[in-house]
Amino acid sequence: ITIRKAIEELVNEGYLYRVHGKGTYVKGEGEQNNLVSITSCTEDIEKLGHVPSRKVLNKNVIEADAKRKNVLNLGEEDEKIFSLSRIYYADDEPVNYTRTYLPYKYFPEIELFDFSRVSLYKILEEKYNVKITKATRTIEAISAHDELIDYLDVEENVPLLQFCCTTYGIVNGKEVPIEYFKCCYRTDKFKFYIYQAR
């Protein structure tokens, strides 16, 4: 048996996983991601050894309401935000629904990008030269309801993990809120861990 064939068999049996363009890795116990690093959903899916894909439900430049102005630290004159809704898939199975809001003044014409093909963070970093620095997250258990049942292909009242997050980055030399999102993960597909020390 060749080394290549042995690796192929271990991948097929679930002991190893491949990340395109990066290499082959040992799969840990369970499907889990850590909450310390700032990663995109695409990166989370890749880390678990799955092939990520995205479906854009809608993308619009809209008027910012009071809540979004507050969380994104926008002034009264900053009326426009970019709204983006997507479903993320792991090996063609829906695992996450995300609704994202960004201050349009920092990212003009961002609505022109095809977010079914490219990661939002990649666009922010490579096209708008943003350095993502930190994020604050709240985590809540919710029950699947309304459109989430269809988006994630789950039964009503199935538990989901909901994240509300504000992401910060350096824009024009200043650290500012660059993104607010709310997302829901299927709990049968994702686990998260937090490393703590004392």
Task: Describe each PLM feature range.
Residues 1-26:
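N-terminal helix-turn-helix
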Residues 25-38:
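Short, cationic-aromatic polyanion-contact patches
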Residues 51-198:
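C-terminal all-alpha effector/ligand-binding and dimerization domain
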